[in-house]
Amino acid sequence: MHVEGDSMMPTLHNDDIVLIDVGRRSPTPPGIFVLHDGMGLVAKRLEHIPNSDPPAVRVISDNPLYPAYERTADEIRIIGRIRWFAREI
């Protein structure tokens, strides 16, 4: 998958290629995941929110210009954990 946009900079840049481990969908431990947020596929850092009812995650962009937000497990679909990326030099 190609990354689109600058919300995950400086970690991931626009047009980086990411390899997704679709067998790793649990946001524990925290990490960078590809998820479907109802509008499309996005790469974001996810953190499980302990003791949340219903279960929820904090969705975080590495770029500080984009604020973090929270979503319940029903509001997103985690595709998998990003394990590798490549960038053209």
Model regions and ranges:
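Acidic/glycine-rich C-terminal interaction modules and beta/coil loop segments
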Residues: M1-I89
